[in-house]
């Protein structure tokens, strides 16, 4: 029947295309497919597919290099930095067979064949330690320089503080050692400490005068002759004992404060809570108009007559007291 022949021809055509036999009853019979053709050059195909692939695709890097017909390294290479032969092969960089990575044990640095040389050691410990050491030295030197500069900066201020405590003196007091017998225990000094030593010795002489010692015979003699020193000194110490030595000076007046011409208790001028006392440290008195203060007209001359070494009997006097001698004309 032509219809059956046409149907069989159609089944054969499906067999050639699908690789299976379909019977007229609807049964499908499996048929094995023909094997694939083998690659004539399997090595070339393996290199093309495995180059640049990670190692999980199968085989080690050495095996892959052998399959890629890469010759093995003949001995250790020389380091391009230090020319040391103490090197070793590490691995292929980025799983690329064209970038073998080596390590130099001499300079402890890696390098890649065909790559740039980086001067970074393994771990970077040495360079980091050197930087810390250098920074520490720099910090220590900077701190020492700051300390020295602070010391130098403090020295002028201390010098100024020291000079501010010095007292002004008359130039005639610099030669007091030549007069002798005034009992000030002065020594010839040089430099800036001269005025300071004179001031300290004069202050001690003031305190010694109040206690009745450390004074010369002419000065104490005149005071003892003209005054009843026992009662006067007791009254003076009773009133001045609670005051500091600097409270004896009147800061409000530029000249000496003379209140009475009686005994020494009146000359000190104890009035109220403040005590005015003649400063034994001779100040350079400012210019005073003679018309305004006629009683002190003779004070424009050198104070206490210290310029003439010949008059040593009553040269050092207590202004305001009854002294006999050349100094009485000042009163």
UniProtKB/Swiss-Prot annotation:
Compositionally biased spans, kind Low complexity: 135-160
Molecular-function GO term, any one: zinc ion binding
Compositional bias (Polar residues): 305-316
Annotated spans, Disordered: 121-166, 291-331
Keywords, in A-Z order: DNA-binding, Metal-binding, Nucleus, Transcription, Transcription regulation, Zinc, Zinc-finger
Short name of any one Pfam family annotated for the protein: Zn_ribbon_Dof
Tissue: Expressed in the vasculature (mainly in the phloem and associated cell files) of cotyledons, leaves, roots, flower stalks and petals. The PEAR proteins (e.g. DOF2.4, DOF5.1, DOF3.2, DOF1.1, DOF5.6 and DOF5.3) form a short-range concentration gradient that peaks at protophloem sieve elements (PSE).
Biological process annotations from GO: regulation of glucosinolate biosynthetic process; regulation of root development; response to insect; response to jasmonic acid; response to wounding
Protein name from the UniProt record: Dof zinc finger protein DOF1.1
Traits of the deletion mutant: Reduced expression of CYP83B1. Longer hypocotyls and increased lateral root formation.
First and last residues of each zinc finger (Dof-type): 77-131
Top-level taxon of the source organism: Eukaryota
Functional note: Transcription factor that binds specifically to a 5'-AA[AG]G-3' consensus core sequence. Enhances the DNA binding of OBF transcription factors to OCS elements. Involved in the regulation of root development. The PEAR proteins (e.g. DOF2.4, DOF5.1, DOF3.2, DOF1.1, DOF5.6 and DOF5.3) activate gene expression that promotes radial growth of protophloem sieve elements. Element of a regulatory network controlling indole glucosinolates (IGS) biosynthesis, probably by inducing the expression of accurate genes (e.g. CYP83B1). Promotes apical dominance.
Species the sequence originates in: Arabidopsis thaliana (Mouse-ear cress)
Induction, per UniProt: By auxin and salicylic acid (SA). Induced transiently in response to the generalist herbivore S.littoralis. Triggered by methyl jasmonate (MeJA) and wounding.
Assigned GO CC terms: nucleus
Record-listed Zn(2+) binding positions: 79, 82, 104, 107
Quaternary assembly: Interacts with OBF4.
Main localization of the protein described in the UniProt heading: nucleus
Transmembrane segments: none
């Amino acid at each position: 029947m032509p219809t059956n022949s046409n149907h069989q021809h159609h089944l054969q055509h499906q067999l050639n295309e699908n690789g299976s036999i379909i019977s007229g009853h609807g049964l499908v019979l499996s048929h094995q497919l023909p094997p694939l053709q083998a690659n004539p050059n399997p090595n070339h195909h393996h290199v093309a597919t495995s180059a640049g692939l990670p190692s999980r695709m199968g085989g080690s890097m050495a095996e892959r290099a052998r399959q890629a017909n890469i010759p093995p390294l003949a001995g250790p290479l020389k380091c391009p930095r230090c020319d040391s032969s103490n090197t070793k092969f590490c691995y292929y960089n980025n799983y690329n067979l064209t970038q073998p990575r080596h390590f130099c044990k001499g300079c402890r640095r890696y390098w890649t064949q065909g790559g740039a040389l980086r001067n970074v050691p393994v771990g970077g410990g040495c360079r980091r330690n050197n930087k810390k050491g250098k920074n520490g030295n720099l910090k220590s030197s900077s701190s020492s320089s700051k300390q020295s500069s602070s010391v130098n900066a403090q020295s002028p201020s201390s010098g100024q503080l020291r000079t501010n405590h010095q007292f002004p003196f008359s130039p005639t007091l610099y030669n007091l050692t030549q007069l002798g017998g005034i009992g000030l225990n002065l020594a010839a000094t040089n430099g800036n400490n001269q005025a300071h030593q004179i001031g300290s010795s004069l202050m001690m002489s003031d305190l010694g005068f109040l206690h009745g010692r450390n004074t010369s015979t002419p000065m104490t003699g005149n005071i003892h002759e003209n005054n009843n020193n026992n009662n006067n000194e007791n009254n003076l110490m009773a009133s001045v004992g609670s005051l500091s030595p600097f409270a004896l000076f009147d800061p409000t007046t530029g000249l000496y404060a003379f209140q009475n011409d009686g005994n020494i208790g009146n000359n000190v001028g104890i009035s109220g809570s403040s005590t005015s006392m003649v400063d034994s440290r001779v100040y350079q008195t400012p210019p005073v108009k003679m018309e305004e203060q006629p009683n002190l007209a003779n004070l424009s001359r050198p104070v206490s007559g210290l310029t003439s070494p010949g008059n040593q009997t009553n040269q050092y006097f207590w202004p305001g007291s009854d002294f006999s001698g050349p100094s009485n004309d000042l009163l």
